Amino acid sequence: MTPLTGGRDGGNSYFPQYESTNMHTDAQGNVLTTESAEAAALFSQAITDFMDYRTTPSARLKEALEKDPDFALAACFRGCFLMMLENRKILPRVRETVDTLRKQANSLTRRERLHIDALGAWADLDILEACRTWEELLTIAPHDILAMKLHHTMAFYTGRSQVLRSVIEGALHAWDETVPGYSAVQGMYAYALEECGAYDEAEKWGRDAVASNPNDLWAIHAVGHVLDMQRRYEEGADWLNFSAEDWSDRNPFKAHLWWHCALFHLGMGDPDRALTMHDDLLRSINSDSYVDVSNQASLLKRLEMQGMDVSTRWELLADHSATRIDDHILTFRDAHFCLALAAAGRTETVRDQLASMVAFAKDNDGWTAEATASTLIPLCDGIVAYESGDYKATCDILWPMRNDLAPVGGSHTQRDLFRQILEDAAVKGNCTELARTLFSERLAQVPGDSMYQAKYVALSA
């Protein structure tokens, strides 16, 4: 898609350059091209709800567009929600939306045009270009919390931790507690700091965010990551001790926090509790959501590697994954679809998925295609080898790439599953020297980790 050109200058709150009677502002003061004050208010509330992971943003945007059908940024935001479904079937619809919005270019601000350009790149599966566009937008409108959150979300799926951090730091000069939404910025910054290894700073920013807004699931999540990386399992389980009723009005992301809580119980040596959480809080959410597939698949595999029998729980995940083998929207998602299929013994379907990945990487450009070729396909080859019991092949594939998995996306904690698979393969395949090296690396990174200390000692027994 061709980026927008022309249009009016200005259009951001930080350096306002003009005023117009057909404009209103969002909660942070960013100019909105709409004649409807009601539509502007609904748009602002949709952003707030989006930050809090509530189920209501789409409905608010629909209502805003009913108030003003020409409200370009509301339509763009709605397109972003469609993209977050991560379903290839919606791509033509989103691209049509982008084409329609570009016809309004001359009446929109530069900030709004950049939002549309970012959505266009995203719909073309060039996540990196979408992120670069949001980064440009934030240089002219650092108060644009929507752009910041969208960038944060998608940069997360490129595995570029330092980018998460630097982009927020570049906008921090415009933020303090007097600006609505500041706690959400604190929460995003906390997560970025954690992914960059600045755990003490991350915990402070995250706890400050939660103190200001106890509804901020991302800030709660950021602190949970710190507790996980520092092996503070009991604190983590207490921190994430929320019931289904507590989060009844939240979207499926809530299950990811329960996934973290289950990992804390697993770390505390209570796999039975972790499996119960899977059955009661994860499996019951929505298996059609790729987030829930990744949560469940990664937890089930961790449980299996600790000797738990998860019985037929793979089957539902494999059934869903089998319907999505040609999507290739996110490498992170495809990796977990592959895991679910391979763990359930769907050999032919996995072969079809891998062939589809190869064709996609060959026939397409952009970040997703490049990451599929460089990282996803060999990772999935390693997963398939592991599930087929060929542990030597698993080690041969995963050992050289163990420190280069970031392009798959996700967090350090999420990608750690693939290292655990390598470690388990090294033990089961009697690759003793390799296993000893892997466990030594673990203990150097987290001294005193009792589980890995026991594994290390067992190799010499």
Predicted regions and their residues:
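Inter-helical turn/loop elements of alpha-helical hairpins
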Residues: 37-40, 47-62, 66-70, 75-112, ...
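Residue-level recognition of tetratricopeptide repeat
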Residues: 38, 71-74, 110, 144-145, ...
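Structural register within alpha-helical repeat arrays
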Residues: 38, 45, 78, 117, ...
